[in-house]
């Protein structure tokens, strides 16, 4: 009899988990507390409890070729950066294509997940759910938690002296939907992540004045990168990743700063990060520099004091009149349906091996999918996690001894720099390609560049020097997709299809053959260094 797997949440990771279970012959049941799939990507006019919330104008920060499921490309006529409404349609197409809807129970809240009395023998879980006010209990052989980390707003009011005296309006960015409420108002946005920056820029079109307060600064990138290419298709390549990871961290940090400043000098705009030794997730926004240079958005330091109708910033004695404060101060994550002994969260970190498995369980039958912030797209990350996790749940792949897993988790929490490559500032951040390759290696699905160079050199060159698109993860191993090679070789065609809407006659490039030869030599040298 097939193992029964309970999946909590029908967002991008939940859908991938359902599909992976079906591919491995398991019996998944997905519980979704809302009335539709999509999680974060389903816009609603009102905030729903226990579900991520987005604003009407949200567009993906990762382009369609980099953020699709590995065996299901976005439609070629979709824009490279996808608005939330089209992203939701894509998720629905994915669910229909692989018959996932039959496994989802909508309007069903997971109340409690507990180990069965004989857990040490069976590894089973009791899952208590609630549908239309009625509670039910069922036994499952495994559980996959796919609830994400954008549901519990972090609102540190204690850090803002005088906030209780403020007579204006204030709220967390989770509540933001449209900019209309800011018309002719003086607005302060606290926090310079992607949401805070988006809200400040969007608000500046209607507001009287907009301040964006940041404590540590941030690198700001445009989605439009070198030569007009999508940023992640240029930045996320195996060649660049190997190059960065082979250099000392100070050199990589200097190169990163130089690249970030090639768009505009961050110091001249008051944005340069105070701590440049550790990489904080860059902010993706195409308009912020223009808003700053035209005076629509003013960058300010942290808040010293909030008064009845104004605020005082640190190092600036002048009071600034404020009508509305938006706290874009991020989120905390928790698992209210799980006992703390199962997944313990301390200081914003969970003791999960490879960000997936609790290290102390005698039976590895619970997996957390999507609780990670890679410098890359979440969909292929969560999908690859699910592919490996399902094979562990099924017993095909084995985990290391508990001592080895604990040692790795503790090392990650300490976040000690290795001295090479990028050093990330948060425990939930990771090197996208390195992390994906670790998981692919566990299921024997990592592409073998040396072998491909001998049998399919065109594909090998594209994989190594081109963008690390998710199709690479389906070239071999379990779940191999016969369309992967073609998807890789045509990825730029789909990218340009929606931008080249006016055909221009191009002159031939005289050095094209030379560049190809140099690329081949560089690949051979890289492979030589790898196997040295």
Curated annotation (Swiss-Prot):
Localization: Endoplasmic reticulum membrane
A Pfam family annotated for this UniProt entry: FMO-like
EC assignment: 1.14.13.148, 1.14.13.8
Gene Ontology MF: a single term: hypotaurine monooxygenase activity
Gene Ontology biological process: energy homeostasis; negative regulation of fatty acid oxidation; taurine biosynthetic process; toxin metabolic process; xenobiotic metabolic process
Bilayer topology term: Single-pass membrane protein
Amino acids binding NADP(+): 60-61, 195-198
SUPFAM superfamilies named in the record: FAD/NAD(P)-binding domain (SSF51905)
Segments on the Lumenal face: 2-510
Names of required cofactors: FAD
Extent of the signal sequence: none
Gene3D superfamilies, sorted: FAD/NAD(P)-binding domain
Protein name as annotated: Flavin-containing monooxygenase 1
UniProt source species: Canis lupus familiaris
Source organism phylogeny: Eukaryota, Metazoa, Chordata, Craniata, Vertebrata
């Amino acid at each position: 009899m097939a193992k029964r797997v309970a999946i909590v949440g029908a967002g991008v990771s939940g859908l991938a988990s359902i599909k992976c279970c079906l591919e491995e012959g398991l019996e998944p049941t997905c519980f979704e507390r809302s009335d539709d799939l999509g999680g974060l990507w389903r816009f609603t006019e009102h905030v729903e409890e226990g579900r991520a919330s987005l604003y009407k104008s949200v567009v993906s920060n990762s382009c369609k070729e980099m953020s699709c499921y590995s065996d299901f490309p976005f439609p070629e006529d979709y824009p490279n950066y996808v608005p939330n409404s089209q992203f939701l349609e894509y998720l629905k197409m994915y669910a229909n294509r692989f018959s996932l809807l039959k496994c989802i129970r909508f309007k069903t809240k997971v109340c409690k997940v507990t180990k069965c009395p004989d857990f040490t023998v069976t590894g089973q879980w009791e899952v208590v759910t609630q549908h239309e006010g009625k509670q039910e209990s069922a036994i499952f052989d495994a559980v996959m938690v796919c609830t994400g980390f954008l549901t519990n707003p972090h609102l540190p009011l204690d850090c803002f002296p005088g906030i209780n005296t403020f007579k204006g309006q204030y709220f967390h960015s989770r509540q933001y939907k449209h900019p209309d409420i800011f018309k002719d108002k003086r607005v302060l946005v606290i926090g310079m992540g992607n949401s805070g920056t988006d809200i400040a820029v969007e608000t500046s079109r209607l507001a009287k004045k907009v301040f964006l307060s940041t404590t540590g600064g941030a690198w700001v990138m445009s989605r439009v990168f070198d030569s007009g290419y999508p940023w992640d298709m240029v930045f996320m390549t195996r060649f660049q990743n190997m190059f960065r990871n082979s250099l000392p961290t100070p050199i990589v940090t200097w190169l990163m700063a130089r690249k970030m400043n090639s768009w505009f000098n961050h110091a001249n705009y008051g944005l340069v990060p105070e701590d440049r030794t550790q990489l904080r997730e860059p902010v993706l926004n195409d308009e912020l520099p223009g808003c700053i240079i035209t005076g629509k958005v003013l960058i300010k330091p942290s808040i010293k004091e909030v008064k009845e109708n104004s605020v005082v910033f640190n190092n600036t004695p002048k009071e600034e009149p404020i009508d509305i404060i938006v706290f874009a101060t991020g989120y905390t994550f928790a698992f209210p349906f799980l006992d703390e002994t199962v997944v313990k969260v301390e200081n914003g970190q969970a003791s999960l091996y490879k960000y997936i498995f609790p290290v102390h369980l005698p039976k590895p039958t619970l997996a957390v999918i999507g609780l990670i912030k890679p410098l890359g797209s979440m969909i292929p990350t969560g999908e690859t996690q699910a592919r490996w996790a399902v094979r562990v749940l099924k017993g095909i792949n084995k985990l290391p001894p508990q001592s080895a897993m604990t040692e790795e988790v503790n090392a990650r929490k300490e976040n000690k720099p290795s001295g090479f490559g990028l050093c990330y500032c948060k425990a939930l951040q990771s090197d996208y390609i390195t992390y994906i390759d670790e998981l692919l290696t566990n299921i024997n699905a990592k592409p073998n560049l040396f072998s491909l160079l001998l049998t399919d050199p065109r594909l090998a060159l594209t994989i190594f020097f081109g963008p690390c698109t998710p199709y690479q993860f389906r070239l071999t191993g379990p779940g191999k997709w016969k369309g992967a090679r073609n998807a890789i070789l045509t990825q730029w065609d789909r990218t340009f299809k929606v931008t080249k809407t006016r055909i221009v006659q191009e002159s031939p490039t005289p050095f094209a053959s030379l560049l190809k030869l140099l690329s081949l030599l560089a690949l051979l040298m890289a492979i030589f260094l790898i196997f040295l």
